[in-house]
């Protein structure tokens, strides 16, 4: 039976993916959000989903309300619903109920969730009817789907309403310092989540924190080293991607190619292979569809402007920066790697300042954008982007969105734009600069 859903905060990456999925399942979907453009709204607009400014008039009693986690009682629509006792569900609570109708595959972890969810979704949807929610704002819904693949987010323990059949956990790392007190707090959250997985867990076996996880369901370890249950070996990394074999209990279960770069993407693929092997999916089909994976939004997304290679990536944690630069070096071994990074949130920048500097030193040159503050925090003046620049050993400087011309001082470079804020504004400024140079040279 068709329902009408109204999303408060529809441009959020999880919210937009869920909206698209419910729309494709035949439900009427609309939503509201701030007017600022966000990369997720293109998919919503293409689907014909109405995006409204916040207003009490958007809400009618026949609607099911789904509220983004960033929106509280000071939002006029949330306040209206509370005042009139109109029930609503938070995104993660709705998802926890929704997945009960499917055999669900979750992907959790500090880093690599979106890429791994995208890879798992791509393979499974090409084998059988599958619904999915990816953290890049992409969602697909099918009323007949048996399987549901989704991204499981640890922030504020949002994954606690989830009880999936299977879950991958890619790694544990200290992030979200505005919520978690330290690595032990993060690990405890993942341990509580792991206890809710019903059939099997697939965890990276070379992560010391992950090895402390305990759960009633069987735990399968994957990685590169002996002793793991699923081992990736005979690895060849080229400018076309990565080739490798996987063995389980001493037996080779397949030879695989992923058109993706960096060691982290071999691990992501091995996690997907392990999960689908245990779930009884044909490994020959898995190998076929791994070959055709084209990636997810804002994860090593490439474009060429005026013969200049530009990479856009959501990396906003030191571990992710190192992985993204590693991927760029694999694909472009003869080029200078120029990193343009925007720190995301003051709390994360303060907590991980030394680690950010160390990670950015993996690039050949570094440019920094002003820190992007979260809506949840206030700039108390405790950290400036210049503090980060001072700790970077490689050539580095701060640029503004109005003047990105210093980036032109490189002849044979790949430009890697990284961040979770509005780093794309800097990228667009650089693209315009390159386009104008072309016009002036004609």
UniProtKB/Swiss-Prot annotation:
It catalyses: UDP-N-acetyl-alpha-D-muramate + L-alanine + ATP = UDP-N-acetyl-alpha-D-muramoyl-L-alanine + ADP + phosphate + H(+). It is found in: Cytoplasm. Its EC number is 6.3.2.8. GO terms for biological process: cell division; cell wall organization; peptidoglycan biosynthetic process; regulation of cell shape. Pathway: Cell wall biogenesis; peptidoglycan biosynthesis. ATP binds at residues 109-115. It comes from the Bacteria. It is an enzyme of class 6 (ligase). Cell wall formation. PANTHER family: UDP-N-ACETYLMURAMATE--L-ALANINE LIGASE, UDP-N-ACETYLMURAMATE--L-ALANINE LIGASE-RELATED. This is UDP-N-acetylmuramate--L-alanine ligase. The lineage of its organism: Bacteria, Bacillati, Bacillota, Bacilli, Lactobacillales. The gene is murC.
């Amino acid at each position: 039976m068709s329902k009408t859903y109204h999303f408060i905060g529809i441009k959020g990456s999880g919210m937009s993916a869920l909206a698209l999925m419910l729309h494709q399942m035949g439900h009427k979907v609309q939503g509201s959000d701030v007017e600022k453009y966000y990369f997720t709204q293109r998919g919503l607009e293409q689907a014909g989903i109405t995006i409204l400014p916040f207003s009490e008039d958007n809400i009618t009693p026949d609607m099911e309300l789904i509220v983004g986690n960033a929106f509280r009682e000071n939002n006029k629509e949330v306040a209206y619903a509370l005042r009139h006792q109109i029930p609503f569900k938070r995104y993660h609570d709705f998802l926890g109920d929704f997945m009960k109708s499917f055999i669900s595959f979750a992907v959790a972890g500090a880093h690599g969730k979106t890429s791994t969810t995208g890879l798992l979704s791509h393979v499974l949807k090409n084998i059988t009817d599958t619904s999915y929610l990816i953290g890049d704002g992409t969602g697909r819904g099918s009323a007949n789907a048996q399987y549901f693949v989704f991204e499981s987010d640890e922030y504020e323990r949002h994954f606690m309403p989830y009880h999936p059949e299977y879950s991958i956990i890619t790694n544990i790392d200290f992030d979200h310092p505005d919520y978690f007190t330290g690595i032990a707090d993060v690990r405890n959250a993942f341990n509580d989540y792991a206890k809710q997985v019903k059939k099997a867990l697939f965890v990276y076996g070379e992560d010391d924190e992950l090895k402390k996880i305990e759960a009633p369901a069987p735990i399968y370890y994957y990685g590169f080293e002996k002793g793991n249950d699923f081992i990736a070996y005979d690895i060849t990394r080229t400018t076309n991607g990565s080739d490798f074999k996987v063995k389980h209990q001493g037996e080779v279960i397949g030879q695989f190619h992923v058109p993706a770069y960096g060691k982290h993407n071999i691990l992501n693929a091995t996690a997907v292979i392990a999960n689908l092997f245990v779930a009884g999916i044909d490994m020959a089909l898995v190998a076929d569809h791994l070959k055709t994976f084209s990636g997810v939004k804002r994860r090593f997304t490439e474009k060429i402007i005026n013969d200049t290679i530009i990479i856009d990536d959501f990396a906003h944690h030191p571990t992710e920066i190192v992985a993204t630069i590693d991927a760029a070096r694999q694909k472009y071994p003869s080029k200078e790697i120029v990193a343009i990074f925007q720190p995301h949130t003051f709390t994360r920048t303060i907590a991980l300042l030394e680690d950010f500097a160390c990670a950015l030193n993996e690039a050949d040159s570094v440019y920094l954008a002003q820190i992007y503050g979260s809506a949840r925090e206030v700039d108390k003046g405790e950290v400036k982007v210049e503090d980060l620049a001072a700790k970077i050993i490689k050539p580095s400087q701060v640029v503004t969105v109005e003047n990105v011309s210093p980036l032109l001082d490189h002849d044979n470079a790949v430009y890697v734009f990284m961040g979770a804020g509005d780093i794309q504004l800097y990228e667009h400024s650089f693209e315009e600069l390159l386009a104008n140079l072309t016009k002036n040279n004609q």
